[in-house]
Amino acid sequence: SGSCSLKTCWLQLADFRSVGTQLKERYDLAKVVRVTRKSRLEPRNRKLGTPTPTDLVHLESSPDYCARNGSSGSLGTIGRECDKRSAGMDGCQLMCCGRGYDHFKVTVTQRCNCKF
């Protein structure tokens, strides 16, 4: 017969949340390296091992996001609200950087223009 079959293959990206989760995991495990005279990457701490091709690496340590830093524009975390029930980035354990936090209850009264 005069027919032919056609196959098409393509690559598809993983969903955004999956990509973000993997990047965060790699960021948390990133290794600090230095560049050698031969332009190779060498770990600053040899106990952590040589980075693999899939590891994230950085030449400088991350800034302290807990403290105010005018040169980087970071306002720090002092005085920010946190959620004591959350284990995420908005949780008091992470956001308060081990400094402790104040717990207080706020009652807000508003006029509502309700009609009964």
Curated annotation (Swiss-Prot):
GO terms for molecular function: cytokine activity; frizzled binding. InterPro entries: Wnt (IPR005817), Wnt_C (IPR043158). A lipid is attached at residue 1 (O-palmitoleoyl serine). GO terms for cellular component: extracellular space. Disulfide bonds join 82-97. Keywords: Developmental protein, Disulfide bond, Extracellular matrix, Glycoprotein, Lipoprotein, Secreted, Wnt signaling pathway. Palmitoleoylation is required for efficient binding to frizzled receptors. Depalmitoleoylation leads to Wnt signaling pathway inhibition. SMART domains: WNT1. Ligand for members of the frizzled family of seven transmembrane receptors. Probable developmental protein. May be a signaling molecule which affects the development of discrete regions of tissues. Is likely to signal over only few cell diameters. This is Protein Wnt-5(III). It comes from Eptatretus stoutii.
